[in-house]
UniProtKB/Swiss-Prot annotation:
Aquaporins contain two tandem repeats each containing three membrane-spanning domains and a pore-forming loop with the signature motif Asn-Pro-Ala (NPA). Coiled coil: none annotated. It catalyses: H2O(in) = H2O(out); NH4(+)(in) = NH4(+)(out); H2O2(out) = H2O2(in); formamide(out) = formamide(in). It holds the Pfam family MIP. One of its GO terms (cellular component) is mitochondrial membrane. It comes from Rattus norvegicus. This is Aquaporin-8.
Length: 263
């Protein structure tokens, strides 16, 4: 080999700086609507579609399929909707995910509350549509797809623990697959969907494997079922907080971590 070669590290630095400049230019070129309104509209739309499909899969679930039908419906629907709409809003459709993504720097803090509002309204719309298209008897037999599995105080600790752990897996899949630069990749929507399938199959019999306050809230409003509803807020939001701190402190890339930096 002849001639001088550009050092690889210098080349990489220039490429990285160029990418950062292009991303910044692209972001600043976006309109106010595209930065602040459009993502909230997409979060509302995506949440409505996801929760509509999820609720129907529970209401119309055959006893012979057990957890398989809702697990596949929730996971495949979420992966599909993220792949379709994720480039606009990030594809959260879940207040716990939005909390974690905000903590790791993937979402502007000022957008967190608007995202939550959009997701909750989307949840109500999706649950309302499911109620409209479902036979009344099946709807009420399934408690409107609300989470009614916890019936006794003795079940609370187990259900809360399952919600925390299962939601942590989902939120890790989102943050590491779609936000953290070192580990993000094009298969993130599928890994996120798979995490939902796995979570429901594993924990559905204990807590219902909600992992999403919006998924719990919409059906609860439509069915008027609020027993132990707080579990499906506290568990997922604690999980989002834990994962955000875990990534910020230990497993995030150099740009994301707050401690243990190389320089």
């Amino acid at each position: 080999m002849s001639g001088e070669q550009t050092p690889m590290c210098s080349m990489d630095l220039r490429e990285i700086k160029g990418k950062e400049t292009n991303m910044a230019d692209s972001y600043h070129g976006m309109s106010w609507y595209e930065q602040y309104i459009q993502p909230c509209v997409v979060e509302l739309l995506g949440s409505a579609l996801f929760i509509f499909i999820g609720c129907l899969s529970v209401i119309e679930n055959s006893p012979n399929t057990g957890l398989l039908q809702p697990a596949l419906a929730h996971g495949l629907a979420l992966g599909l909707i993220i792949a379709t709409l994720g480039n606009i809003s990030g594809g959260h459709f879940n207040p716990a995910v939005s909390l974690a993504v905000t903590l790791v720097g993937g979402l502007k803090t000022m957008l967190l509350i608007p995202y939550w509002v959009s997701q909750l309204f989307g949840g109500m719309i999706g649950a309302a549509l499911a109620k409209v298209v479902s036979p009344e008897e099946r709807f009420w037999n399934a408690s409107g797809a609300a989470f009614a599995i916890v019936q006794e105080q003795e079940q609370v600790a187990e259900a809360l623990g399952v919600e925390i752990v299962m939601t942590m897996l989902l939120v890790l899949a989102v943050c590491m697959g779609a936000v953290n630069e070192k580990t993000m990749g094009p298969l993130a929507p599928f890994s996120i969907g798979f995490s939902v399938i796995v979570d429901i199959l594993a924990g559905g019999g204990i807590s219902g494997a909600c992992m999403n306050p919006a998924r719990a809230f919409g059906p609860a409003v439509m069915a008027g079922y609020w027993d132990f509803h707080w579990i499906y807020w506290l568990g997922p939001l604690l999980a989002g907080l834990f994962v955000g701190l875990l990534i910020r402190l230990f497993i995030g890339d150099e740009k994301t971590r707050l401690i243990l930096k190389s320089r």
